[in-house]
Structure formats: structure tokens, C-alpha cells
Amino acid sequence: MKNIFSIILISTTFTAAVFAQDCGQSFYAMKEKTKITTSNFDGKGKLTGTSEATVKSIQSTANGFVATMEVNAKNEKGKSVVEAKNFDVICENGTIKLDIGSMYLNEMAAQMKGMELTISGTGIDIPATLSEGQTLSDGDSDIKMGSNGMTFMTMKFSIKNRKVEKKEKITVAAGTYDAYKITYDMDMKVLFKKSIKAVQWLVPSIGMIKSETYNAKGELEGTTEMTKFEQ
């Protein structure tokens, strides 16, 4: 189960960069062999894990393209927790979408044989042009697990109150960038409900270079930042 949530964390990192109005102008690094390495830290700044995402291939379609991404993740000790999991980034008629369902299902299938799994949701979007004060749409995702037509467990994720606060220069381990700062609220419900507040910094043609999550008391719970960008 821990690996499932690792995948969810990684994939939501990439969903910060999707859905441009032009397939060639997305907040996403759409070039073959591009590799983005990120590091995760707890609220006290202690390393909790790293992940790598590589654009393996890009294929043109009648209305856009399909890019295949490969994700690898390691814990703080360098041990793999998610190894070589693929998902597709699909651009169709100017909208980019993530097809991460198969990645969830492949990981869950190995841990929960005999379980029936369904995934649904609206996703999130990022317009090709951002401006300070701009309000962005909400998004959600549900993962249901069951057997013989009965649901045993439902995981719900919803993102709301997304807003572009400002554009600012920010420095991470990978370098200094002009980034858009976006804030939002996220509700997660698995065995219990948890609400967090988050901040993300997005850079055109790269994606999210940093994020911070805070608990209901406003205390920093974790940070993710890009430590290497190879293209």
C-alpha cells in the first residue's frame, strides 16, 4: 500500500504541469530523453525520498501527441519503492491529459490480487497563459477497490481553491527560474480525512520545480523540489 501512495504523490507532481491550450506551449517538459529529478523532504528538512521522471517517447497523432513517461522512485536510503512505472501524457485538441490509471492498476494488482479496481476523476488544468490573481478550476480523483461487485475501500482526492498568486524568481537545487506561484487546498480521504494547503511553483516548458504542503494548523509538512533537469 505504501508504494501506491508513492505513485500517487509522484503523479500529482506531474499533474501540476498539464492541460495547455496549445500542445506546443504547455507547462510540461515535452521533449524526448528529458529527465527531471526531484527530492522530497519532511517538515524539518530531512530527506524522505527522490524520484526521476523521463520522457521515453513522443508520438504524433491527428490531434496532438502521446508522450510516454517513465517514473522511478527511491526512499531516503536509496532503495527503490517505485521502479520503471510508465504512464502516458496525451495532448488532444490543445488539452494535455495524464493517463496514470494503468500505472495505479499495475502497482495495485501486485499487492491486491483478486481485487477489482476502478479509477475516475476530472483531473486538473493549467491554461497556456497565467496571470497574477487568476483563479484555476478544481479537480478530483477517486480510486475504488472491491470484489464481486462490492466496494471495500475508496480513496478520494480533491483539489480546490487554486489561484495564481504571483510570478517570482525562485532558486532550487537545479537552478534559478522565473516561476508562477500557485496555491490550493487538497482533501484526501482514505481511512480518514485529511486536509492540506499547498503551494506550487511552475515554470513553462519544465513544470513544477517546487512544492510545499502545510497541515490545518499552517505547519510545514513537506517540501518537494527539482534537483536536476536534463534535456
Predicted segments with their positions:
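Sec-dependent N-terminal signal peptides
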Residues: 4-15
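N-terminal processing/targeting junctions
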Residues: 15-16, 33
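General secondary-structure propensity
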Residues: 18, 22, 119-120
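Acidic, serine/threonine-rich low-complexity disordered tracts
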Residues: 21-87, 142-231
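Solvent-exposed helix/loop surface patches that form functional interfaces
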Residues: 29-31, 91-95, 99-177
